[in-house]
Amino acid sequence: MFVPVLVLMLMLLPSLALAQSGGNATNGKEIYQERCVLCHGSKGHGWDWGKKVVRPPIPVPNLVEVVPQRSDDYLLTVIRDGGEAVRLTHLMPAFGFNMSEEDLRDVVAYLRSLQRSAK
């Protein structure tokens, strides 16, 4: 009896990890590269001023530092509804009008993976 239960638990581990994060980090990375990288950079640290065209000096948060301090719900709200939804800058646009809830959760999962890979 113990062995079949153990096998079943091992088979369910990947789906439990996905459910815990609420999204797929691999898909989230693709979306991030397409929609977020211009402002937040390829690793979430903000603009690489040496490689960008001249832009106004708009502060962009270092996501590797900010994400661990925020809940998934908070991050979903910022991405879906924009910075003003949580009393941040109006310069963070809302993406909820053209991203599914699954896409939003995938991006949050990717942001969480950035935090883990930075350690």
Predicted regions located by residue number:
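Bacterial N-terminal signal peptides
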Residues: P4-S15
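Boundary at the C-terminal end of the N-terminal hydrophobic targeting segment
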Residues: A17-S21
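Periplasmic/extracellular electron-transfer cofactor-ligation site
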Residues: G22-G23, K29-P59, R80-H90, L114-K119
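Extracytoplasmic electron-transfer domains, predominantly the class I c-type cytochrome c fold
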Residues: V54-S113
